[in-house]
């Protein structure tokens, strides 16, 4: 039996908010050292449109910046903004030496290709970690650069929970460039050493595959798709999904799974706070390296 399992006790709920505060304290110390040298880390957030959820996310990021001592600038663009409008804004930020991190809040206006936007950001300022050169470094086994925030936050959650990842079997449910693919790469990297399977809606025997996972990362955005009988007893379940349903918010994992898992991250309050904390960490790193 792998020693990453926790059996017979019911799931321990892993509070991402507590871990995120520890990360933000680390960032705050790093920011203070830079400020002493006359350098103030500065994050620019571009948001196009009036999507309510996006504006909530941006406010949360601004609050985290304030907590960490990071300057933040918000650039609001209309929902009618074209790709060219957004690229022009990004280019101005790329050329501004006082801006160390650039984030274009998703979703982009309808018809605008977010991949082109990600590719337009200076890789040194790409605090989301989505630029092809940063993702390419990860593919090559180099995790020293700016990493996608949600996957790196999940690795931090696993480490803070004292989970032995080496030799574990991990299943990542979802294959997006934002979470699924980079998550699999991070779990497989040298020093983590999990054996990783990427699963998706076309995967045959999906339930059985998930049930074999010592570490299960659910990132598909389908409310409660992962049932309790998908979960290996004592395993570590990371719920990345967040969907609006009648009565509030729901993750990808059904509540009943907590009776089977050894650890589980809640929705909300699990992965979300860690994503923002790692964004702060990336902004600090970007400022240190520019």
What are the residue ranges of the model-derived segments?
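Short glycine-/small-residue-rich Rossmann-like dinucleotide-binding loops
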Residues: 107, 219-222, 241-242
């Amino acid at each position: 039996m792998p020693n990453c399992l926790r059996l017979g006790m019911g799931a321990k709920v892993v509070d991402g908010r507590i871990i995120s505060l520890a990360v933000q304290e680390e960032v705050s110390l790093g920011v203070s050292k830079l400020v002493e040298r006359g350098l103030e880390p500065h994050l620019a957030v571009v948001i196009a449109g009036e999507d309510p959820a996006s504006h909530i996310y941006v406010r949360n990021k601004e609050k985290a910046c304030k907590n960490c001592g990071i300057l933040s600038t918000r650039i609001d663009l209309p929902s009618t903004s074209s790709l060219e409008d957004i690229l022009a804004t990004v280019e101005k930020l790329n050329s501004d030496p006082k801006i160390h991190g650039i984030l274009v809040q998703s979703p982009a206006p309808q018809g605008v290709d977010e991949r082109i936007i990600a590719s337009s950001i200076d890789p040194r300022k790409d605090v989301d970690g989505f630029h092809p050169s940063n993702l390419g470094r990860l593919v090559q086994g180099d995790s020293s650069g700016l990493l996608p925030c949600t996957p790196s936050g999940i690795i931090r959650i696993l480490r803070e929970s004292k989970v032995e990842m080496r030799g574990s079997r991990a299943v990542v449910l979802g294959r997006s460039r934002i979470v699924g693919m980079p998550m699999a790469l991070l779990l497989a990297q040298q020093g983590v050493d999990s054996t990783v399977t990427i699963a998706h809606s076309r995967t045959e025997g999906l339930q059985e595959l998930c049930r074999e996972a010592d570490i299960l990362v659910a990132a598909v955005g389908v409310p409660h798709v992962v049932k309790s009988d998908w979960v290996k007893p004592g395993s570590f379940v990371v719920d990345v999904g967040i969907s609006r349903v009648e009565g509030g918010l729901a993750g990808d994992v059904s509540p009943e799974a907590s009776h089977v898992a050894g650890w589980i991250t809640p929705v909300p309050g699990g992965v979300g706070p860690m994503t923002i904390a790692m964004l702060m960490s990336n902004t600090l790193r970007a400022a240190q390296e520019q």
